[in-house]
């Protein structure tokens, strides 16, 4: 009888702990979801992507990665051209890096992955996250440079929505490769971005484009390019 009571007693507290953990998790998730979807940002396009404000300030001489933000090189800008898992925190806990990022000259909006062969819903989701974080950071006083990314030609229906006109805009040019079809698609994306948004300057993170778009281009070397020069 005592054994049974002991088991029941243990199960009761075990269940209570699970319930407490679950309640805490639910509360945290509720706060995050409320923050994400009840933020009051203006939206743009059919997918209702948050509208990012223009960036027209002077650019810093160099950029460091989001992973290196704690090195306190505040005269630099910060870029987020990293694997998604290294920047997930800006979505999962949006306010966690605010106080640090405010000290930098500017921050390029996070570049969540968009791929040619990824389902449309996932590409829309990652572009939504890009626009939301950029808008949230701007609302918190951070100087944010909008960033653009795209998948296949069909993604042009939504991938430039939420980006401002006549602004500095950043794009990544890291994993395009030598495949001619991908390079043509990338060039078409650049040309479409310029046609629709008329950026004042285009920041290109990675290798040179190999062509000369009709706007001023500022190149930012990726880390591997910098290391090769050492």
Predicted regions and their residues:
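Intrinsically disordered, low-structural-confidence terminal and linker regions
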Residues: 1-21
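Residue-identity detector for glutamine
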Residues: 5, 10, 42, 51, ...
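Intrinsic disorder/low-structure terminal segments
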Residues: 8-11, 40, 54, 148, ...
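Non-catalytic, usually N-terminal nucleic-acid engagement modules in DNA/RNA processing proteins
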Residues: 24-98, 118, 230
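Eukaryote-skewed repeat-based solenoidal scaffolds used as protein-protein interaction platforms
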Residues: 67-70, 83, 88-229
């Amino acid at each position: 009888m005592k054994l049974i009571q002991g088991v029941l007693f243990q199960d009761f507290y075990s269940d209570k702990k699970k319930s407490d953990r679950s309640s805490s998790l639910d509360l945290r998730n509720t706060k995050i979801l409320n923050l994400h979807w009840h933020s009051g940002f203006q939206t743009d396009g059919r997918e209702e992507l948050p509208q990012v404000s223009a960036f027209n300030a002077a650019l810093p001489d160099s950029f460091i990665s989001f992973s290196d933000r704690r090195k306190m090189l505040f005269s630099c800008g910060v870029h987020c051209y990293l694997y998604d898992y290294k920047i997930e925190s800006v979505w999962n806990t949006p306010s966690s890096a605010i106080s640090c990022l405010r000290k930098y000259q500017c921050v390029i909006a996070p570049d969540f992955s968009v791929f040619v062969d990824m389902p449309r819903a996932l590409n829309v989701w990652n572009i939504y996250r890009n626009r939301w974080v950029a808008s949230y950071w701007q609302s918190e006083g951070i100087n944010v440079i909008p960033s653009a990314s795209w998948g296949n030609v069909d993604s042009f229906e939504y991938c430039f929505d939420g980006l401002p006109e006549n602004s500095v805009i950043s794009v990544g040019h890291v994993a395009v490769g030598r495949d001619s079809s991908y390079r043509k698609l990338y060039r078409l994306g650049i040309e479409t971005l310029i046609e629709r948004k008329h950026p004042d300057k285009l920041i290109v993170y990675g290798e040179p484009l190999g062509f000369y778009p009709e706007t001023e281009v500022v190149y930012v070397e990726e880390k591997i390019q910098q290391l090769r020069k050492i």
